[in-house]
């Protein structure tokens, strides 16, 4: 390839990159839940602060390379130069200030966006228990006494309290349009608190590779009005399927690309029974739930000032 063709090739590369990026989804930067909005703001702030260093370095690299090129006879030549107080001050003070700012935002966001921290709201939360299976998601509504597979429905502008575990390998529960992910582990209970600021349907995925059926381990999360949610619960209660012991054992067997399933009856204790199956794994150490309670106690002083407002608009 001749040297003349290199500039033309480099000119094409940005367009190829744009073509590839056109298929990307901007869900993380266009969230529909307050937790997701707070996380997006943190990403933008952290990226902006880091670009304060990156962009000047890139610009100076290009400028210096051009200004001090061999063919530029007008460039100042100072072979004995060794020190500049102004440069030293800039390369030390600016990064230190950026690190302090990053530390401040990161510290506050770590407590503010703690997945174990319940969202501040006057509306009663909806409780949903999540069980990761091979390769499908089981959702149990303990207060409504129903269960679903690969689909959840909840009211918009209402906090949703998720308890998450696994009856298979380690997994990760993630609804990108609403907020962050949380791991699902056998014999352990993790927690996640989310809210949808508006009605809509959101994609839910497994964010942790878990075997052959991993790519099909997806579900739909639908935020509706309270009235529509009540109607949906009534419809599920009409389903002929019941999540009894035999049905659960059949469901827990590995299977791929499972369709949505609705169960009119499910024991409120089903989630805890699944966790307790692995009781021997946790013998002699505190449960994840207890550890989370201790973490919350240590950060209680910053709880009220940094709570995401449930149902707030961006």
From Swiss-Prot:
Gene Ontology annotations of biological process type: ATP synthesis coupled electron transport
Membrane-related topology note: Multi-pass membrane protein
Region (Disordered): 278-314
UniProt subcellular location: Cell inner membrane
Topology feature Periplasmic, residues: 24-42, 108-314
Lipid-binding residues (covalent, S-diacylglycerol cysteine): 24
Lipid-bearing positions (N-palmitoyl cysteine): 24
GO molecular function, one term: cytochrome-c oxidase activity
Gene Ontology annotations for the cellular component aspect, listed alphabetically: plasma membrane
Positions with biased composition (Basic and acidic residues): 278-293
Residue intervals annotated with topology Cytoplasmic: 64-86
UniProt entry tagged with the keyword NAD: no
Membrane spanning stretches: 43-63, 87-107
Main location: membrane
The keyword Transmembrane helix is assigned to this record: yes
Annotated InterPro entries: CcO_II (IPR045187), CcO_II-like_C (IPR002429), COX_ARM (IPR010514), Cupredoxin (IPR008972), CuRO_UO_II (IPR034227), Cyt_c_oxidase_su2_TM_dom (IPR011759), Cyt_c_oxidase_su2_TM_sf (IPR036257), Cyt_o_ubiquinol_oxidase_su2 (IPR006333)
Entry-linked CDD domains: CuRO_UO_II (cd04212)
This protein's UniProt keywords: Cell inner membrane, Cell membrane, Electron transport, Lipoprotein, Membrane, Oxidoreductase, Palmitate, Respiratory chain, Signal, Transmembrane, Transmembrane helix, Transport
Function text: Cytochrome bo(3) ubiquinol terminal oxidase is the component of the aerobic respiratory chain of E.coli that predominates when cells are grown at high aeration. Has proton pump activity across the membrane in addition to electron transfer, pumping 2 protons/electron.
Subunit text: Heterooctamer of two A chains, two B chains, two C chains and two D chains.
Family recorded in the similarity comment: Belongs to the cytochrome c oxidase subunit 2 family.
Name of this protein: Cytochrome bo(3) ubiquinol oxidase subunit 2
Annotated organism of origin: Pseudomonas putida (Arthrobacter siderocapsulatus)
Taxon lineage: Bacteria, Pseudomonadati, Pseudomonadota, Gammaproteobacteria, Pseudomonadales
Name of the encoding gene: cyoA
